[in-house]
Amino acid sequence: MTYELLNTIDDPADLRRLDRRQLGPLANELRAFVLDSVSQTGGHLSSNLGTVELTIALHYVFNTPEDRIVWDVGHQSYPHKILTGRRDQMGSLRQLDGISGFPRRSESPYDTFGTAHSSTSISAALGMALGAKTKGEDRVAIAVIGDGAMSAGMAFEAMNNAGVYKDLPLVVVLNDNDMSISPPVGALNRYLARLMSGQFYAATKKGVEKLLSVAPPVLEFAKRFEEHTKGMFVPATMFEEFGFNYIGPIDGHDLESLVPTLQNIRQRAREGGGPQFLHVVTKKGQGYKLAEADPILYHGPGKFNPQEGIKPSGRPAKVTYTQVFGQWLCDMAAADKRLVGITPAMREGSGMVEFEQRFPDRYYDVGIAEQHAVTFAGGLACEGLKPVVAIYSTFLQRGYDQLIHDVALQNLPVVFALDRAGLVGADGATHAGAYDIAYLRCIPNMMVMTPADENECRQLLSTAFAQDCPTAVRYPRGAGTGVTVQPTLEPLPVGKAEVRRTSTAPAGQRVAILAFGSMVAPASAAAERLDATVVNMRFVKPLDVACVLEMARTHDFVVTAEEGCVMGGAGSACLEALAAAGVATPVLQLGLPDRFVDHGDHAALLAQCGLDANGILASIRERFAVQPRAAAPRVA
């Protein structure tokens, strides 16, 4: 497809020079460009196909970047990136040293607020609106929220706060793509949207309220009339009770409705009309039939042929850690009726589809509400059930107070299955599970486990389930190492490490590598070159202190390796144990550096951080001047 209109747009100022009649053809080009780009790089597709018209309308109407747009979650921001000067960079999307798959302030002045976790947009936009007002600057702040993000408490906290500012230039756009819109009613539908957002409706409402102040019976009648007639068209009551002027719902793919509605909203917001709430209904995957039919499959695909769609690779794939968890969950649920599963809106991503199908009465999707999920699990545990919370490592951060106060303080037996621990590749720093070891091991009563492979993941999940205290099992994204997963549900001994390899190096050259979780494999590869001892530590807490001390006393050097932050991590736990015992063996800590690790291929990022086999080898040689075995082949 040729992109005659799209190629003329390098920023929204170019867009605003177009005639309104050109916006429809532009939307077709933009949608085709998104599809073509994502099919070549991988990334979020369905949500971006659904926001094409909305993105065009927002940048066409509002004076961006002076007017601030905040994209909640941010995975629907590709059309925004394309229209704001990054069209020619889309080939580097989510690649190493390329542009991010989410809004990023350092990337563009049009990315007014960095997002990736949900439900933050209204709070950020409220802060921007009040900041502009405080400084006497004339601008509007717009929060675009959808994809279930409105279910989180933070969104309602922000609306509750915003509603007290009656003249605030704040606009909330609810991108409702979770339900289908009724067939359009043509001119009437567009007229009602313009009427509700325009000056006539505002003036009429104000006049009725004035009349009410002098004639209470008339006012009561007027209020009832307004609520009943407006309620025939829009579910406005809840949002208006928060202090917002509600408009909608309108078709989010109909530019003939979107543009004039947003123009009226912008005018009202700038003229002191107070917070505005626009409800638009869009369809995930819009314009690409395969994505419309299965928006979940096309939510975040890898590279694919748009003409053929996503096809199985044909190659036997290694089982993923997520699949191992899903199978274990079903097997343990069949064996123990106390097990209940909880997910904060990540059924597919966390591997709980089969569990929901087989045990629907024991499956709880609480929506995007991590704080609630943790305390809810605590309540279930109080009644003698055994809750398993399946959650991405990065999202458990959102329920940290609840983890401490509502679960650990009461020593409740809740299992936290932490998917996406460590680096996550293309999703980058916002989704990396870099901090869980550090933020979990400092909590009293908490047990923290790090499986080295997919079979051990199953074993440690069983170990966690057998405990009478809160536990966490952290495992990485993607495929395992290829080992056979045994069907057993037997637990492993708590707090016991496993020596995988024993060094035969001479005195002065003896190195012990204490590896946690995913670092066991690269540490083992490096150890072959060095003739080093490798210990699969398994437990961060309780740490196998006896093993740590033995390794330090029988080796010249100790190395700790973890796919988590070095500061406060598992290596720090080992150093604390050595310090407490007065053992002064030199220690090298390897882990994620004290910076946010960007997006890119997972293997490339590990190499960048020195956590692949060659990086581990190089760090040990540099620090301790240990010589590799000459006959060993080079580590791949």
Curated annotation (Swiss-Prot):
Q: Which cofactor does it need?
A: Mg(2+); thiamine diphosphate
List the GO molecular function terms: 1-deoxy-D-xylulose-5-phosphate synthase activity; magnesium ion binding; thiamine pyrophosphate binding
Q: In which pathway does it act?
A: Metabolic intermediate biosynthesis; 1-deoxy-D-xylulose 5-phosphate biosynthesis; 1-deoxy-D-xylulose 5-phosphate from D-glyceraldehyde 3-phosphate and pyruvate: step 1/1
* Annotated thiamine diphosphate binding sites: H75, A116, H117, S118, G148, A149, N177, Y288, E370
Paste the cofactor note: Binds 1 Mg(2+) ion per subunit.
- Cross-referenced CDD domains, in alphabetical order? TPP_DXS (cd02007), TPP_PYR_DXS_TK_like (cd07033)
Q: Which positions bind Mg(2+)?
A: D147, N177
Q: Which reaction does it catalyse?
A: D-glyceraldehyde 3-phosphate + pyruvate + H(+) = 1-deoxy-D-xylulose 5-phosphate + CO2
GO CC field: cytosol
Q: Which GO terms describe its biological process?
A: 1-deoxy-D-xylulose 5-phosphate biosynthetic process; isopentenyl diphosphate biosynthetic process, methylerythritol 4-phosphate pathway; terpenoid biosynthetic process; thiamine biosynthetic process
**Cross-referenced InterPro entries, in alphabetical order?**
Dxylulose-5-P_synthase, THDP-binding, Transketo_C/PFOR_II, Transketolase-like_Pyr-bd, Transketolase_BS, Transketolase_C, Transketolase_CS
Pfam families tied to this protein: DXP_synthase_N, Transket_pyr, Transketolase_C
**Alphabetized UniProt keyword annotations:** Isoprene biosynthesis, Magnesium, Metal-binding, Thiamine biosynthesis, Thiamine pyrophosphate, Transferase
Question: Which EC number(s) does UniProt give?
Answer: 2.2.1.7
- Spell out the HAMAP family in the cross-references: DXP_synth
What family does this chain come from, according to its entry? Belongs to the transketolase family. DXPS subfamily.
Q: How does it assemble?
A: Homodimer.
Main function: Catalyzes the acyloin condensation reaction between C atoms 2 and 3 of pyruvate and glyceraldehyde 3-phosphate to yield 1-deoxy-D-xylulose-5-phosphate (DXP).
By what name is this protein known? 1-deoxy-D-xylulose-5-phosphate synthase
Q: Provide the taxonomic classification.
A: Bacteria, Pseudomonadati, Pseudomonadota, Betaproteobacteria, Burkholderiales
